[in-house]
Swiss-Prot record:
Species annotation: Rattus norvegicus (Rat)
UniProt repeat feature ANK, residue ranges: 631-662, 666-695
Zinc finger intervals, DZANK-type: 230-290, 359-407
Molecular-function annotations in GO: zinc ion binding
Domain of life the protein comes from: Eukaryota
Encoding gene (name): Dzank1
Name of the featured protein: Double zinc ribbon and ankyrin repeat-containing protein 1
Subcellular location, record wording: Cell projection, Cilium
Keyword Cell membrane applies: no
Tissue expression: Expressed in retina.
InterPro entries: Ankyrin_rpt, Ankyrin_rpt-contain_sf, DZAN1, DZR, Fn3_assoc_repeat
Length: 757
């Protein structure tokens, strides 16, 4: 423990250890002792589990903190005791917490005969000393055995201490007893002579030296001490003996017995300057003409000092003939603008409708809404000893929260103002009438502005422009016309929709085809490279094929080469058109379903010269000659753009005979289809079932690892999955690039780091 710290208190039950019971199991007759190894400390404790607060003031709410005086007894139940030791210089120790399981045990009662005799002996001396003899009291002591409840309540009342809250039910039982008041006087000396062997109760810890008393004794003590404390908040009774309400909680307090109103004190009489009548000087206004007496009580100075000028910068008084301050050398105001302070007389400011408030320290008249005096800085409206109730005008303590005479809340009222706002707050009429014509307003000549202290000030306006309404309207018209020109010049781009309308809306169908073709070209760099190479002429034929799952649209354009343009020879290209093959020469086939078979059958009859003229890059987009089985088609759909890549569906299709190396209509393997559509979770399933991870596809010969690298950040997870499946990182495409080279070319550091690992 560090030097100067306070030792934590110890909570010890005073009993002999009983076999079969834990240390925390006690009864209601077991006393608890609290002590600390540090000398000269006070111990504060609580019984409801809350933190002990020894700094809480009386009347500030419910107080559950008690000061330890002597061993205490706990009520039955599970009680949590928290204690803290506090030294005289307010150094605190740590808080000690102990939980006791208290069982009810009947109290050990003293026989009624012995108890009555001891009580009679204890109080007979007091009665003889005070000159009172109570025959009724002896009669009550004979029936003490029938009033055990008073003994219990007294046991709780015996240790009551100032600043702690008592049990309201106990006070109620004692306060509303039917026992009459036997002994009218109470002296502390008599109570101090009583034996002191009763334990301290947690609710009352400050009336020491009491033993179990009967109902008559308790009633006498309660009647004689109840007026000293408020029954609701236990705050001290107001010092005013005629106060009817508690100044802390506002509850009614009983009157003091035997007190009468004192005779009125003689007030100082004086002559009113307005009406000339002799009136008391302790009233704010004249009782005859209602003129204010505060200005009349201020003495007039007979000696005057020389004129001086107050510096506006530092507030120093300077002789009137000087032009610069002797302290700060600032420019002094001219003579016609100066404030003159002659002798001890303070300046008087102009008022509104003659309403002013006088300072209690210097007597200066201030504006009615001022909070502090303009001359001495004192707070206005607050006396040095008491505050005034705005409703009844009674004097209360400065810290009083409620008025002792009428009981209204006065905590927020810091000073008294003679206006209607306080009357609204207090809920009553104004305490004083409005000032009449006898109220003299104070007029001070206003200072004239100085002509020599004027300065020309300017502000920068360069660059600031505020357009007019016509100019704003003109700009709006120009912006509208510019938008119209842009709309006319821009190409028509149809809206990209998920499903085309069909049902004969051929224009919307063409817009749908155009929008999706543009989107497909933007997302596929290989297709962009192929579609950008050939030079096409006019569209010569177009066919549409439907097979129940897909819709195939074939467009045939005239291919234009540089040789045909510059030789200017007429060539019969009708035999070399692709439409002659797909459409059967001079006419179309009657059935669209035979289009693929007819094309595959006629391609073998095409001359060798036609085969040489064909672009070898277009073979990747030819239809797959091998028909797809239902399992392979469903597998490609699951890893395609419309699929979800569900592992359970893929495993079921592979179990049913789907080929993991099957290709779609574009010739892409299933692994590459899964990579392009970002179904990276399907790659390990296909690899375990025999899929070729390093299979190349397309005109550039890219593998699945190349395709995943081209996706950038979106394909980073696919790259990690392929590397986990032992994909060949040294595999090169037709351009001689590995997947790592593509990542470096794209500047993708995150993907490059995967290859480095």
């Amino acid at each position: 423990m560090t030097a100067g710290s306070v030792c934590a208190p110890q909570i010890i039950p005073l009993r002999v250890p009983q076999p079969g019971k834990a240390n925390h199991e006690i009864d209601t007759n077991t006393l608890l002792e609290m002590k600390s190894d540090t000398p000269d400390v006070n111990i504060y404790y609580t019984l409801d589990g809350s933190k002990p607060d020894f700094l809480k003031k009386v009347g500030s709410g419910e107080n559950n903190t008690f000061k330890y005086i002597k061993p205490i007894a706990l009520p039955d139940g599970k009680i949590q005791v928290k204690a803290v030791a506090v030294s005289k210089d307010c150094r605190q120790s740590g808080i000690v917490t102990k939980v006791f399981q208290v069982d009810y045990e009947p109290p050990k009662m003293v026989s009624s005969e012995d108890h009555g005799e001891d009580a009679l002996k204890g109080f007979s001396k007091q009665e003889l000393k005070n000159g009172f003899v109570g025959p009724k009291l002896r009669k009550k002591y004979k029936n003490a055995e029938n009033k055990s409840t008073w003994n219990v309540n007294l046991r709780r009342l015996a240790d009551l201490k100032v600043g702690e809250r008592a049990d309201p039910k106990t006070l109620k039982d004692l306060r509303f007893s039917e026992s009459p008041l036997e002994i009218p006087a109470y002296h502390e000396g008599a109570s101090a002579r009583l034996p002191t062997h009763q334990a301290q109760s947690p609710g009352f810890a400050h009336i020491t030296g009491q033993k179990s008393l009967t109902s008559t004794e308790v009633m006498r003590i309660q009647r004689e001490t109840d007026f000293l404390k408020c029954a609701h908040c236990l705050a001290s009774r107001p010092s005013d003996p005629f106060a009817r309400f508690c100044q802390e909680c506002g509850a009614p307090v009983p009157p003091i017995f035997g007190y009468r109103l004192p005779p009125p004190e003689g007030a100082q009489m004086g002559l009113c300057a307005e009406c000339g009548s002799m009136v008391p000087m302790n009233t704010p206004i004249c009782v005859v003409c209602e003129a204010p007496l505060a200005p009349q009580l201020r003495p007039q100075a007979s000696l005057y000092l020389k004129e001086r000028v107050i510096c506006r910068t530092c507030g120093t008084g300077n002789p009137a003939h000087l032009r610069y301050c002797v302290t700060c050398e600032g420019t002094l105001p001219p003579t016609q603008e100066q404030w003159l302070c002659n002798g001890d007389e303070v300046p008087r400011l102009p008022t509104r409708n003659g309403e002013t408030i006088s300072c209690s320290r210097c007597g200066c008249q201030n504006l009615w809404e001022a909070s502090f005096c303009d001359w001495c800085g004192a707070m206005l409206g607050i006396s040095a000893s008491h505050s005034v109730c705005p409703k009844c005008g009674a004097s209360n303590h400065l810290t009083a929260r409620f008025c002792g005479s009428c009981g209204i809340y006065v905590k927020s009222i810091t000073r008294f103002r003679m206006n209607n706002s306080l009357a609204i707050v207090a809920g009553g009429p104004r305490p004083f009438p409005e000032p009449r014509s006898a109220w003299q307003s104070l007029n001070v000549p206003l200072p004239t502005p100085a002509t020599g202290s004027k300065k020309d000030m300017g502000t920068q306006t360069s660059g600031l422009f505020y357009p007019s309404g016509k100019l704003l309207a003109k700009k709006e018209l120009e912006a509208a016309s510019h938008r119209q020109r842009q709309e006319k010049m821009s190409d028509h781009r149809p809206v990209l929709t998920a499903v085309s309308p069909g049902r004969g809306y051929w224009r919307k169908q063409l817009d749908h085809i155009s929008a999706h073709l543009r989107s497909y070209a933007q997302n596929n760099p290989e297709f962009r490279a192929l579609i950008a190479e050939p030079r096409m002429g006019k569209l010569i034929s177009a066919t549409v094929h439907e097979d129940g799952y897909e819709v195939s649209i074939r467009l045939n354009y005239i291919q234009v080469s540089n040789k045909n343009l510059y030789l200017n020879k007429s060539m019969n290209l009708s035999d070399h058109f692709l439409s002659s093959v797909t459409e059967g020469g001079n006419g179309l086939y009657g059935s669209r379903s035979s289009l693929v078979s007819a094309y595959s059958q006629s391609i073998s009859d095409t001359p060798e010269s036609i085969k040489k003229m064909k672009n070898p890059k277009a073979k990747s987009f030819l239809a797959n000659p091998e028909p797809l089985t239902p399992e392979n088609r469903l597998l490609l759909e699951e890893v395609g753009s419309t699929g979800k890549g569900r592992l359970s569906v893929l495993e079921q299709l592979l179990d049913e005979g789907a080929d993991p190396n099957c290709c779609d209509s574009q010739g892409r393997p299933a692994v590459i289809v899964a990579v392009v559509n970002k179904h990276f979770e399907a790659i390990p399933v296909l690899a375990q079932r025999g899929a070729d991870i390093d299979q190349q596809w397309g005109p550039f010969g890219n593998t699945a690892l190349h395709e995943a690298t081209l996706l950038g950040l979106e394909g980073r997870e696919s790259v990690a999955t392929l590397l986990g499946c032992n994909a060949n990182t040294q595999k090169k495409n037709t351009r001689g690039q590995t997947a790592y080279d593509i990542a470096l070319e794209m500047g993708d550091d995150l993907t490059s780091a995967l290859f480095a690992d």
